[in-house]
Amino acid sequence: MALDIVEYLKEREIAESHLRAQNQPFITLSRETGCHSRIVGEMLQQEIFRLTGKKWHIVSKETILDAAKGLQLNLQQVKQVLDAQNKGNIEEIILAFGDGRYRSYQKVRNILKKIISEIAVEGHCIIIGRAGAIITAGLPAGVHIRLTAPLPWRVQSISKQLSITAKEAAAYITKTDEKRLKLFQDFSGKELETAFFDLIINNQRVSDEETVEIIIHFLQQKNRL
């Protein structure tokens, strides 16, 4: 009987530890192409540190590639999955006969979902893009933000960022938005809906500073800081 009690207490401690882990706060930042997700993410990081003394880390495509490299995944294949590219004939041949680091695209997606989920469970991070909102939807401590703006504003933004013409910027936005939508669908099997997000902010009408202020206030109201 005593042994049963000890085992019970151990199991309870493990369960409570798991629950605490799931309650570590984190943010996902989704965006339409041309919106200032990286800028907002870095400003949020600085403001959270100023207010709490805690350094939240930014999770970008590069972060996930580093984690994938540590797991000895084929980085070319990982990049193709993250960029929502379809595998071609060469990849099919490699999958069948070649590089042992190649896995099925579904397996790679599952591994990447696990990487992102585990990062989110650790908490105190800002996940930029990568279908973060849907991948982490089951974690209660997440706050999911989407930045949006009218197309003309985004064209101007991208044109300035990349030093390209408005026509080139419009084509770039169309292509990138399509890739991001496909990535979301690949990871979730669902269409992108506003219901996945806690806050949707118009990046044209709301400045980056105001956006950070709104998100910080929301985090405080939800006891996430």
Which residues does each PLM region occupy?
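Short, polar loop motifs at secondary-structure junctions
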Residues: 129-133
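Pre-Walker A (Motif I) flank of P-loop NTPase domains
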Residues: 21-27, 31, 123
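Short, amphipathic alpha-helical "lid/cap" segments that border enzyme active or binding sites
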Residues: 113, 208-216
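Post-Walker A helix-loop "phosphate-sensing" segment adjacent to the P-loop in P-loop NTPases
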Residues: 46-55
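Small-molecule kinase domains that catalyze NTP-dependent phosphoryl transfer to phosphate-bearing small molecules
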Residues: 4-18, 84-91, 165-208
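ATP-dependent small-molecule kinase phosphotransfer cores
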Residues: 62-124
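Conserved phosphate-donor/acceptor-positioning beta-strand/loop module used by diverse small-molecule
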Residues: 140-160, 165-173
